[in-house]
Amino acid sequence: HRNIITQSKGFGMQKVRMIAQGRVQGVGFRWGVVTLALEIGGITGRVWNNDDGTVEILAQAESSAIMAKFIQEIRKGPTPFSKVTYLDVQLSNFPSYSDFKVAN
């Protein structure tokens, strides 16, 4: 899935839907994602826990380079105790957000 982002030389807004599996609930993962988005800058969206133990992220970035960095950092795990074993990344389309925050 990694090549989707780097190969699409997106002009303008890039939107992706990610589902993170692993040790991603109860370890500050959602807040880590929000902090990461703010640190990188130019990223807005939402993050929430799913009932199946995964975390879902809708993210939009000003460029594919910014999005690629965001995805790379999420794969590493945005908090010390989180561990992402699998990250599904797909190009997506959803209403634009003006900020990045936890949805639940």
Which residues fall in each region the model found?
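Intrinsically disordered, low-complexity, mixed-charge
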Residues: 3-104
